[in-house]
């Protein structure tokens, strides 16, 4: 498996720039470095209207987009376990693994493109429900807070568990404190 070079991470906290720098190799002699070249694309979005190269902004409840927003302003239902994504992943599994008949042109196209990749589904996901959770889950490669930095280990099978449990582990319950959540693009050290 190839190690991923560019990563998106979440930084949780009002002083997001300081937190992001805290774990960056761009600080000379930083022994707590996990990445380098950390950038938030918010300024680019505001000035040019362009989104980042490796990350998508949060959809906000007011209809706008942002790379940095208060937890309660983000429309989490659009990006985590979205019913449309859940249904699409369910149908993909049924078409490819269960060999269901396509109901429309989009499904015929999907089945034709994915049928030779049936092993992707069966080798990586124990059940349809696990695939649906994985496909529709919001996740990032790392999370930085004032207290610590955690990231997924892309070299082992824990990536599936990381993706499925990301929201519950790092974001669930933050509505009470309503912290600033910021997306950063980073470059791995290796």
Label each region the model flagged:
Residues 1-169, 173-176, 190:
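Acidic (Asp/Glu-rich) sequence patches and key acidic residues
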Residues 178-190:
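C-terminal or internal capping secondary-structure element at the end of a domain, subdomain, or sheet
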